Amino acid sequence: MGNSAAREDFEWVYTDQPHADRRKEILAKYPEIKSLMKPDHNLIWIVSLMVLTQLVAFYLVKDLDWKWLLFWTYVVGSCISHSMTLAIHEISHNSAFGNSKAMWNRCFGMFANLPLGLPYSVSFKRYHMDHHRYLGGDGVDVDIPTDFEGWFFCTPLRKLVWIILQPLFYTIRPLCINPKPITRLEIINLVVQFSFDALIYYTLGGKALFYMLVGSILGLGLHPISGHFIAEHYMFLKGHETYSYYGPLNYLTFNVGYHNEHHDFPSVPGKNLPLVRKIAAEYYDPLPKYSSWVKVLYDFVMDDTLSPYSRMKRKLKGDLKLE
Protein backbone atom coordinates (compact mmCIF):
# COMPACT_ATOMS: atom_id res chain seq x y z
CA MET A 1 0.00 0.00 0.00
CA GLY A 2 1.61 3.24 -1.17
CA ASN A 3 5.14 4.24 -1.98
CA SER A 4 8.10 3.96 0.34
CA ALA A 5 9.17 7.07 2.21
CA ALA A 6 11.96 8.98 0.53
CA ARG A 7 14.17 9.27 3.63
CA GLU A 8 16.84 6.66 4.23
CA ASP A 9 18.42 8.19 7.33
CA PHE A 10 17.80 10.72 10.06
CA GLU A 11 18.42 14.44 9.56
CA TRP A 12 21.87 14.69 11.10
CA VAL A 13 22.68 18.16 12.41
CA TYR A 14 25.83 19.64 13.89
CA THR A 15 24.37 22.43 15.97
CA ASP A 16 23.03 22.43 19.52
CA GLN A 17 19.31 22.23 20.16
CA PRO A 18 17.66 25.67 19.93
CA HIS A 19 15.92 25.69 23.30
CA ALA A 20 18.75 26.65 25.66
CA ASP A 21 19.76 29.73 23.66
CA ARG A 22 16.16 30.85 23.20
CA ARG A 23 15.51 30.39 26.93
CA LYS A 24 18.45 32.67 27.81
CA GLU A 25 17.36 35.27 25.31
CA ILE A 26 13.74 35.30 26.46
CA LEU A 27 14.65 35.43 30.16
CA ALA A 28 16.99 38.35 29.52
CA LYS A 29 14.14 40.23 27.88
CA TYR A 30 11.28 38.97 30.06
CA PRO A 31 12.63 38.04 33.53
CA GLU A 32 9.04 37.92 34.84
CA ILE A 33 8.76 34.46 33.28
CA LYS A 34 10.77 33.20 36.26
CA SER A 35 7.68 33.85 38.40
CA LEU A 36 5.86 31.16 36.38
CA MET A 37 8.41 28.51 37.46
CA LYS A 38 6.45 27.26 40.46
CA PRO A 39 4.50 24.12 41.37
CA ASP A 40 0.95 23.63 40.16
CA HIS A 41 -0.72 22.26 43.27
CA ASN A 42 -3.99 21.87 41.34
CA LEU A 43 -2.34 18.82 39.77
CA ILE A 44 -2.76 16.98 43.06
CA TRP A 45 -6.53 17.34 43.02
CA ILE A 46 -6.95 16.86 39.28
CA VAL A 47 -4.91 13.64 39.25
CA SER A 48 -6.66 12.34 42.36
CA LEU A 49 -10.03 12.95 40.69
CA MET A 50 -8.84 11.16 37.55
CA VAL A 51 -7.75 8.14 39.58
CA LEU A 52 -11.11 8.12 41.39
CA THR A 53 -12.95 8.38 38.06
CA GLN A 54 -11.14 5.34 36.74
CA LEU A 55 -11.84 3.37 39.92
CA VAL A 56 -15.55 4.10 39.47
CA ALA A 57 -15.25 3.13 35.80
CA PHE A 58 -13.62 -0.19 36.76
CA TYR A 59 -16.69 -0.97 38.85
CA LEU A 60 -19.17 0.14 36.19
CA VAL A 61 -17.65 -1.93 33.37
CA LYS A 62 -17.17 -5.18 35.29
CA ASP A 63 -20.45 -6.72 34.07
CA LEU A 64 -20.78 -5.05 30.66
CA ASP A 65 -21.31 -6.98 27.45
CA TRP A 66 -18.05 -7.23 25.51
CA LYS A 67 -19.15 -4.95 22.66
CA TRP A 68 -20.02 -2.19 25.14
CA LEU A 69 -16.85 -2.85 27.09
CA LEU A 70 -14.80 -2.29 23.94
CA PHE A 71 -16.78 0.86 23.15
CA TRP A 72 -16.30 2.46 26.57
CA THR A 73 -12.69 1.29 26.75
CA TYR A 74 -11.84 3.26 23.61
CA VAL A 75 -14.16 6.24 24.03
CA VAL A 76 -13.57 6.90 27.74
CA GLY A 77 -10.80 4.69 29.11
CA SER A 78 -8.25 5.45 26.42
CA CYS A 79 -8.75 9.21 26.75
CA ILE A 80 -8.33 9.21 30.52
CA SER A 81 -5.35 6.86 30.32
CA HIS A 82 -3.51 8.98 27.78
CA SER A 83 -4.33 12.11 29.75
CA MET A 84 -2.91 10.41 32.83
CA THR A 85 0.39 9.68 31.08
CA LEU A 86 0.65 13.41 30.44
CA ALA A 87 -0.16 14.13 34.07
CA ILE A 88 2.77 11.83 34.89
CA HIS A 89 4.82 13.88 32.43
CA GLU A 90 3.97 16.98 34.48
CA ILE A 91 4.82 15.17 37.71
CA SER A 92 8.17 14.05 36.25
CA HIS A 93 9.08 17.75 36.14
CA ASN A 94 8.20 18.00 39.86
CA SER A 95 5.23 20.20 39.00
CA ALA A 96 2.94 18.77 41.70
CA PHE A 97 5.01 19.44 44.83
CA GLY A 98 8.01 21.40 43.56
CA ASN A 99 11.69 20.55 43.18
CA SER A 100 12.29 20.65 46.93
CA LYS A 101 10.01 17.62 47.38
CA ALA A 102 11.28 15.37 44.62
CA MET A 103 10.39 12.13 46.42
CA TRP A 104 6.84 13.34 47.01
CA ASN A 105 6.56 13.79 43.25
CA ARG A 106 7.96 10.29 42.58
CA CYS A 107 5.44 8.73 44.99
CA PHE A 108 2.61 10.78 43.54
CA GLY A 109 3.67 9.62 40.08
CA MET A 110 3.27 6.01 41.22
CA PHE A 111 -0.21 6.88 42.51
CA ALA A 112 -1.13 8.46 39.16
CA ASN A 113 0.27 5.35 37.46
CA LEU A 114 -2.18 2.99 39.18
CA PRO A 115 -5.11 3.15 36.69
CA LEU A 116 -2.74 2.69 33.73
CA GLY A 117 -2.05 -0.94 34.65
CA LEU A 118 1.63 -1.03 33.68
CA PRO A 119 4.54 0.43 35.71
CA TYR A 120 5.66 3.54 33.90
CA SER A 121 6.14 6.68 35.96
CA VAL A 122 9.58 6.15 37.51
CA SER A 123 11.28 4.92 34.32
CA PHE A 124 9.65 7.67 32.30
CA LYS A 125 11.13 10.31 34.59
CA ARG A 126 14.66 8.95 34.09
CA TYR A 127 14.51 8.87 30.31
CA HIS A 128 12.51 12.06 29.91
CA MET A 129 15.13 14.18 31.64
CA ASP A 130 17.70 12.88 29.14
CA HIS A 131 15.32 13.85 26.33
CA HIS A 132 15.28 17.44 27.56
CA ARG A 133 19.02 17.75 28.18
CA TYR A 134 20.13 15.95 25.04
CA LEU A 135 17.31 16.42 22.53
CA GLY A 136 18.08 14.33 19.47
CA GLY A 137 21.22 12.94 21.09
CA ASP A 138 22.44 9.79 19.39
CA GLY A 139 22.33 6.85 21.81
CA VAL A 140 20.74 8.93 24.58
CA ASP A 141 17.38 10.37 23.52
CA VAL A 142 15.03 7.36 23.39
CA ASP A 143 12.29 9.51 21.87
CA ILE A 144 14.23 9.05 18.61
CA PRO A 145 13.16 5.89 16.72
CA THR A 146 15.63 3.09 16.07
CA ASP A 147 17.16 2.55 12.64
CA PHE A 148 14.92 -0.49 12.24
CA GLU A 149 11.81 1.64 12.72
CA GLY A 150 13.02 4.15 10.15
CA TRP A 151 13.95 1.45 7.65
CA PHE A 152 10.91 -0.82 7.98
CA PHE A 153 7.97 1.53 8.63
CA CYS A 154 8.34 3.40 5.36
CA THR A 155 5.01 2.93 3.54
CA PRO A 156 1.58 4.33 4.48
CA LEU A 157 0.34 0.94 5.72
CA ARG A 158 3.49 0.26 7.72
CA LYS A 159 3.48 3.78 9.18
CA LEU A 160 -0.13 3.22 10.28
CA VAL A 161 0.93 -0.02 11.99
CA TRP A 162 3.82 1.86 13.60
CA ILE A 163 1.42 4.42 15.06
CA ILE A 164 -0.84 1.65 16.40
CA LEU A 165 2.18 -0.01 18.02
CA GLN A 166 3.59 3.16 19.61
CA PRO A 167 3.18 1.78 23.18
CA LEU A 168 5.31 -1.23 22.21
CA PHE A 169 8.08 0.84 20.66
CA TYR A 170 8.21 3.31 23.54
CA THR A 171 8.60 0.29 25.84
CA ILE A 172 11.36 -1.56 24.00
CA ARG A 173 13.23 1.41 22.51
CA PRO A 174 15.07 2.35 25.74
CA LEU A 175 16.38 -1.22 25.98
CA CYS A 176 17.84 -0.91 22.47
CA ILE A 177 19.14 2.66 22.55
CA ASN A 178 20.05 3.57 26.12
CA PRO A 179 19.57 0.72 28.62
CA LYS A 180 19.93 1.73 32.25
CA PRO A 181 20.34 -0.41 35.38
CA ILE A 182 17.06 -0.85 37.20
CA THR A 183 16.68 1.24 40.34
CA ARG A 184 15.06 0.60 43.69
CA LEU A 185 12.29 3.08 42.87
CA GLU A 186 11.53 1.23 39.64
CA ILE A 187 11.20 -2.03 41.56
CA ILE A 188 8.84 -0.32 44.02
CA ASN A 189 6.84 1.08 41.10
CA LEU A 190 6.57 -2.41 39.60
CA VAL A 191 5.54 -4.11 42.86
CA VAL A 192 2.98 -1.44 43.72
CA GLN A 193 1.51 -1.49 40.22
CA PHE A 194 1.17 -5.25 39.85
CA SER A 195 -0.24 -5.52 43.37
CA PHE A 196 -2.90 -2.98 42.38
CA ASP A 197 -3.61 -4.89 39.16
CA ALA A 198 -4.07 -8.11 41.13
CA LEU A 199 -6.41 -6.34 43.55
CA ILE A 200 -8.55 -5.05 40.67
CA TYR A 201 -8.69 -8.50 39.09
CA TYR A 202 -9.65 -10.34 42.28
CA THR A 203 -12.23 -7.78 43.41
CA LEU A 204 -13.77 -6.63 40.12
CA GLY A 205 -12.81 -9.33 37.63
CA GLY A 206 -11.19 -9.63 34.24
CA LYS A 207 -13.31 -7.04 32.44
CA ALA A 208 -12.20 -4.28 34.77
CA LEU A 209 -8.58 -5.32 34.19
CA PHE A 210 -9.24 -5.41 30.43
CA TYR A 211 -10.66 -1.87 30.53
CA MET A 212 -7.57 -0.68 32.40
CA LEU A 213 -4.86 -2.34 30.32
CA VAL A 214 -6.44 -2.17 26.87
CA GLY A 215 -7.57 1.40 27.45
CA SER A 216 -3.96 2.38 28.09
CA ILE A 217 -2.71 0.56 24.99
CA LEU A 218 -5.42 1.98 22.72
CA GLY A 219 -5.01 5.48 24.11
CA LEU A 220 -1.31 5.51 23.30
CA GLY A 221 -1.76 4.00 19.83
CA LEU A 222 -4.20 5.01 17.08
CA HIS A 223 -5.96 7.79 18.96
CA PRO A 224 -6.45 11.53 18.32
CA ILE A 225 -4.41 12.47 21.39
CA SER A 226 -1.52 10.33 20.13
CA GLY A 227 -0.95 12.89 17.43
CA HIS A 228 1.25 14.70 19.93
CA PHE A 229 3.87 11.94 19.67
CA ILE A 230 4.38 12.87 16.00
CA ALA A 231 3.65 16.58 16.25
CA GLU A 232 6.25 17.40 18.90
CA HIS A 233 9.52 16.67 17.10
CA TYR A 234 9.00 15.02 13.70
CA MET A 235 10.45 17.24 11.00
CA PHE A 236 7.50 18.27 8.85
CA LEU A 237 9.46 21.40 7.85
CA LYS A 238 13.20 21.13 7.24
CA GLY A 239 15.27 22.75 9.95
CA HIS A 240 12.52 22.86 12.57
CA GLU A 241 13.04 20.41 15.45
CA THR A 242 10.15 21.18 17.81
CA TYR A 243 6.56 22.18 17.05
CA SER A 244 3.68 23.45 19.16
CA TYR A 245 -0.01 22.60 18.90
CA TYR A 246 -2.58 25.17 19.99
CA GLY A 247 -5.83 23.21 19.59
CA PRO A 248 -8.55 22.21 22.07
CA LEU A 249 -6.99 18.87 23.09
CA ASN A 250 -4.56 20.85 25.24
CA TYR A 251 -7.38 20.98 27.79
CA LEU A 252 -7.15 17.19 28.15
CA THR A 253 -3.37 16.96 28.03
CA PHE A 254 -2.04 19.53 30.50
CA ASN A 255 -1.00 21.81 27.62
CA VAL A 256 1.58 19.37 26.30
CA GLY A 257 0.86 20.89 22.89
CA TYR A 258 2.78 24.01 23.93
CA HIS A 259 5.91 22.07 23.17
CA ASN A 260 8.33 24.76 22.08
CA GLU A 261 7.40 26.65 25.22
CA HIS A 262 7.81 23.49 27.31
CA HIS A 263 11.29 22.70 26.01
CA ASP A 264 12.33 26.31 26.43
CA PHE A 265 11.03 26.37 30.02
CA PRO A 266 10.66 22.82 31.40
CA SER A 267 10.32 24.22 34.95
CA VAL A 268 7.12 26.05 34.01
CA PRO A 269 4.07 23.80 34.65
CA GLY A 270 1.70 23.14 31.79
CA LYS A 271 -1.01 25.46 33.05
CA ASN A 272 1.39 28.45 32.74
CA LEU A 273 2.76 27.68 29.28
CA PRO A 274 0.08 29.78 27.50
CA LEU A 275 1.34 32.73 29.56
CA VAL A 276 4.89 32.08 28.33
CA ARG A 277 3.61 32.23 24.77
CA LYS A 278 1.65 35.40 25.49
CA ILE A 279 4.58 37.18 27.15
CA ALA A 280 7.13 36.22 24.49
CA ALA A 281 4.77 36.16 21.52
CA GLU A 282 7.34 37.52 19.07
CA TYR A 283 9.46 34.39 19.67
CA TYR A 284 6.67 31.82 19.28
CA ASP A 285 4.23 33.27 16.76
CA PRO A 286 6.65 32.92 13.79
CA LEU A 287 7.40 29.26 14.57
CA PRO A 288 5.52 26.50 12.69
CA LYS A 289 2.54 25.22 14.64
CA TYR A 290 -0.39 22.80 14.43
CA SER A 291 -4.09 23.12 15.12
CA SER A 292 -5.06 19.45 14.65
CA TRP A 293 -3.32 16.33 15.92
CA VAL A 294 -5.60 14.17 13.76
CA LYS A 295 -4.33 15.97 10.66
CA VAL A 296 -0.76 15.44 11.86
CA LEU A 297 -1.39 11.69 12.03
CA TYR A 298 -3.04 11.65 8.60
CA ASP A 299 -0.28 13.68 6.97
CA PHE A 300 2.43 11.54 8.56
CA VAL A 301 0.88 8.34 7.20
CA MET A 302 0.07 9.63 3.72
CA ASP A 303 3.06 11.89 2.97
CA ASP A 304 5.83 9.88 1.30
CA THR A 305 8.48 12.34 2.51
CA LEU A 306 7.71 11.55 6.17
CA SER A 307 8.69 8.47 8.18
CA PRO A 308 10.20 7.53 11.56
CA TYR A 309 13.46 8.79 10.03
CA SER A 310 12.02 12.34 9.99
CA ARG A 311 13.86 13.38 13.13
CA MET A 312 16.80 15.67 13.70
CA LYS A 313 19.67 13.81 15.33
CA ARG A 314 23.06 14.92 16.65
CA LYS A 315 26.25 13.38 17.99
CA LEU A 316 26.90 14.40 21.58
CA LYS A 317 30.28 15.61 22.81
CA GLY A 318 31.86 15.95 26.23
CA ASP A 319 30.76 14.51 29.55
CA LEU A 320 27.08 13.61 29.68
CA LYS A 321 24.99 14.00 32.81
CA LEU A 322 22.50 11.15 32.47
CA GLU A 323 19.68 10.28 34.84
From Swiss-Prot:
Covalent S-S links between cysteines: none
One GO BP annotation of this record: fatty acid biosynthetic process
A molecular function (GO) term: cis-trans isomerase activity
Keywords for the protein's UniProt record, in alphabetical order: Endoplasmic reticulum, Fatty acid biosynthesis, Fatty acid metabolism, Isomerase, Lipid biosynthesis, Lipid metabolism, Membrane, Oxidoreductase, Transmembrane, Transmembrane helix
Motif (Histidine box-2): 128-132
Annotated EC: 1.14.19.17, 5.2.1.-
Compartments, as annotated in UniProt: Endoplasmic reticulum membrane
Family: Belongs to the fatty acid desaturase type 1 family. DEGS subfamily.
UniProt function note: Has sphingolipid-delta-4-desaturase activity. Converts D-erythro-sphinganine to D-erythro-sphingosine (E-sphing-4-enine). Catalyzes the equilibrium isomerization of retinols.
Subunit structure: Interacts with RLBP1; the interaction increases synthesis of chromophore-precursors by DEGS1.
Entry protein name: Sphingolipid delta(4)-desaturase DES1
Native source species: Xenopus tropicalis (Western clawed frog)
Lineage start: Eukaryota, Metazoa, Chordata, Craniata, Vertebrata
